[in-house]
Amino acid sequence: MTENETFEKVDFHEMELDDEYYDCVFVACDFSKLVIRNTDFEKCEFRACNFTLASFKGALRDVAFADCKMTGADFTDIDRFSDGLVFENSHLDYASFVEARLRKTVFRGCKMYEGYFNDADMAESVFDRCDLERVSFVGTNLEKADFS
């Protein structure tokens, strides 16, 4: 387990991540096209990181993404026990949350052009000041969701 570390400008996109990260900060790191499996992040923060076309298959608990590029990121197979996610001022164009269970997720000031939330459980999530142009919510549980 990696704890209480800060990673700056690390290129992870060709690495094989297989670890648990607790209370870590990632600044301007590149995770593009990475399949993030067998890796859990808890109480971590990602700032200005690149997750273009990354695929999340591990667990994310109490994780914040700020000013990240997440174009085409895939959360479809994210661990079902992931929770406490916050996305702020991030680009999530074409991101897929199909069938993901991410209740109480917070999206603030995010650009989400043509994002896919089909059949996802996004109950009690917040979409505050987000650009939701052409986003698909077919079959999505949006009970008590806030679209302020």
Describe the role of every protein-language-model region.
Residues 1-148:
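Tandem repeat scaffolds
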